[in-house]
Structure formats: C-alpha cells, structure tokens
Amino acid sequence: FPSSYLITGTEGDNLPFDPLKIMVEEAHNRGLTFEAWLNPYRVRARTGKALCSDNPAQKYINSGSDAVYQTANGGIFYNPGSREAIDLIVNGVREIVRNYDVDAIHFDDYFYATTDSSIDSALYAANGGGKSLAAWRRQNVNTMVREVYAAVKAEKQSVRFGISPQGNTKANYDTLYADVATWLGNAGYVDYICPQIYYGFNNATCPYSSVLTEFNGMIKVSGIDLY
C-alpha cells in the first residue's frame, strides 16, 4: 500500500522514515501495547485527496474491477463480496503482523458502507447461492473476519485480533452486515470485542447497560474478551 497523504500531504510519497515502526517502538519503550487500528474496507469516506496510481483501489477503478465500489459522495470502498478484495485485506494484515511488532490488529466498526443493492448486484448474481442479499453480505464479512484471524495467528500466535463494532446491535446486523453474534459464538473469529457503546444509561434506544449485557450474552466461546 502507498504511504498516506496524512504524512506529507500527498499519497504515495517516498518517506525517509517508517512511521509505524517508530510508533510501535516508542509505545513499547513506554510500556504501552500497540494495536494497529484499521478500517478494512474503507479507502476514503467521501471526495477528498486524489489516490496515487499505485493505490490498489485506483488500479481497480482504472480496470473497472468489481473489487471496489464508489458512493454518491465520492467515497471509495473495497467490495466485501469480491474475492480479490478479501485477499488484499488479508494480505495487508499479514504484512503488518509479519513486519512490525504490533500487539494486536484492531478493526473499526465500518463494514458495508451502504445497503444499496447496486454495488454488488453482479457479484451477488454470480455467488449468492440462493441466500438473501443480506445473508450473503453477512457471509462475506464473516469470511473476511475469519481469514484475517487465521492469517494473524499463522504469522504470530501471540498477536490478538479484535473488533470494535457499532454499539447498536440491530444496525450492525441489518445495515453494516456485521454478524457479531457469529464472531462471538464460534472460535476462530476474534480474540476480543470493544463495542462502541456511545450511549448514556438512560438512552431511549440503546441504554448503555442493556446494550453491554446484550453483547456479553453473545459470547459463547471461552477466552473471548469484552472491553
């Protein structure tokens, strides 16, 4: 992957230093663990800085590949239904664990960026296997999560893999197609979750204590932690 525009202002610049290497070393020097926080599918959320020619997403766009989709506001995302996109994400995680002394790989709560059926209609027609679109999309995310977990453990057993799903469990399942119950109910998906429960105790829709109890109740496998 090319260097981020956030470092120099231009994506793909050659850097005289390795920011991730420095961050990991400085964290460990101070007795801190270092978790690499990633958005697995999101290239950009909206119209912004241009992608460099070496960015895999730009190559997919140029070739007309279904490994990416674009949203009306200029967002660019890897398509969870694309085998090519899954491999890219898994190999990217593998590269981090292999080359850096990170303590964990940690995914943010963004999975499918839209419920629009047009973003993967051809992939669904070819690979849906009789499942509903929603069930097929959840299967795609589950496949990626499971393969990332396996890649992390194959590289370094001590490195943990966790996810911070959205605090609203219904939105996770119905809108983001994130099947958190499967991740927590079966071995081989995650070591922990840290749900983003940004709600007060008296929230009318998602009161903190109730949501926390719901997430905790999904854990059916010994050794999976809830933070």
Where are these regions (language model features)?
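Active-site-proximal loop/short-helix segments
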Residues: 43-56, 82, 99-134
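Active-site beta-loop-alpha junctions enriched in small/polar residues
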Residues: 39-43, 107-112, 164-168, 198-200
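Aromatic-lined carbohydrate-binding/catalytic grooves of carbohydrate-active enzymes
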Residues: 1-15
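Active-site-adjacent "subsite" loops/lids of carbohydrate-active enzymes
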Residues: 13-25, 35-36, 41-99
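Conserved, mostly hydrophobic/aromatic
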Residues: 27, 89, 96, 105-108, ...
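Glycoside hydrolase catalytic-domain groove-lining segments
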Residues: 116-227
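Catalytic domains of carbohydrate-active enzymes, especially glycoside hydrolases
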Residues: 1, 99-104, 186-193
